[in-house]
Amino acid sequence: MYKIQLLSCIALTLALVANGAPTSSSTGNTMKEVKSLLLDLQLLLEKVKNPENLKLSKMHTFNFFMPKVNATELKHLNCLLEELKLLEDVLSLSPSKNLNPKEIKDSMDEIKDLMDNIKRIVLELQGSETSFKCEYDAATVKAVEFLNKWITFCQRIYSTMT
């Protein structure tokens, strides 16, 4: 009699795990990834706001789009990925003549590493669920506001998990 209940329990557990139901360890990993994403976005914001980095001055005039709906779920990170590609394009503009090539390369390498890490974390957080299609608001924001809004998103997600 207990054998049937045990087998039913095992089958249900396997079905939940196979369908991506959150487990305590996956929630812990998600929290770590969201925290890492938050820290990387904050570091990227510091780099963008650095007045010594003249190369980034062009980026401050570029317009970024935010999701039409208030981003509240991990699936909305797909919108961040899409706009991050544009951010990379802006950063690959011609180098400033006021800085020597080594300073530009070092600074841009740091930023590229941060953005690559952000993309990796977002892809890990999304898992196989990357089919979400973003709808963007007609209003645009500048780079600093763009990063601040995604930082706020990560803080909100992290606080709901704790």
From Swiss-Prot:
One of its GO terms (molecular function) is cytokine activity. Glycans are attached at residues 23, 70. Keywords: Adaptive immunity, Cytokine, Disulfide bond, Glycoprotein, Growth factor, Immunity, Secreted, Signal. Disulfide bonds join 79-134. SMART domains: IL2. Pfam families: IL2. It comes from the Eukaryota. Residues 1-20 form the signal peptide. Its main location: secreted. Belongs to the IL-2 family. This is Interleukin-2. It comes from Cervus elaphus (Red deer). The lineage of its organism: Eukaryota, Metazoa, Chordata, Craniata, Vertebrata.
